[in-house]
């Protein structure tokens, strides 16, 4: 029982320690759901760490159980943790299916470690079985080992590539260089350009008087000092503010403890498009159209397309377009690049249907399968995956031949000279062959 609990605790820690991009999202969700401002994930990981430590003590001192504390208390806490483990992951995977895909991607990329342990364990187990069943079955030992060894030869781990190393995926900076400067500000956009990003990704909102500006959240509370400037309007939707009011806000002071961004204003779309033009970047955006009743609800798309047209960056702009809006977009902005968005749920559209509708780019969540990526590329579509922050995930997509990714970790990914632990197939065969010899020698010992 202690071993089972220990394995589950370590799996919990491994999953969340390698999933830094989603930690903040989960924590913000739990804060919103409970109304309590706390670092919930840190509490959960400390709990899992203590359970793992207590399990280690139980396993180490299992012959002297009294020294590990009351057995009934450990059992109660252990069972509670298992219920928490399966309950939390069930909710997570139902709410965000891409996290389940990510778990499989993580396993596949680092599978050589698992394969090695499994090969050695099965070789030892097979040896014991043959030894216990007499000499007539000893011939089964090399045959069984060969089968176990051959499976990964034909199905290698995700860090193994055949032929030449694919071209490094280009990078779109998510809300600018959002880990180095306040998100969706000119500072973050220019920082991303200076780092060498291929393009910028942002969120566009329209003010109460028709000015297009950058803002991701529905309200201004998280990324501005609206609570100090307009104390009674902290929770009001951003689209209810006029540009005069928005221009008085500080969108930089919230960013850590660095005074360098104090006074950074909320930028208008025109200013960001100027950064795109001056640095020869590509541009992709989410347009947040206000609900009915807003004075510019029906004009937001036209205003945005006109702004892009006037700025002369249409040929470098990816417009995320619903099929019903394609004609309107092509009429207003003929040079724009139509992008099809693929989210967490639903069946991805066929390559043929996207090409027929005039799309040139697929902008998908990173859970998209490698087979689907290649199918889109074979149809002439550019494939961009979002949001990719972890070096191993970027490496996986690099080896898969993805065209580009959208990331918060611009500086880290741009600095990578090659994929993490990337291994040519020939080198992999040498390594795997060496491990196979070790397994064979170990199993042959009497």
Segments predicted by a language model, with ranges:
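Internal/C-terminal transmembrane anchor helices
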Residues: 133-158
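Membrane-interface segments at or immediately adjacent to transmembrane helices
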Residues: 157-214, 221-223, 248
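Short, aromatic-rich amphipathic segments at membrane interfaces
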Residues: 250, 392, 407-435
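His/Asp/Glu-enriched short active-site or ligand-binding loop at hydrolase and phosphoryl-transfer sites
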Residues: 316-324, 333-373, 380-390
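Metal-dependent phosphodiesterase/phospholipase catalytic core, i.e.
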Residues: 2-141, 216-336
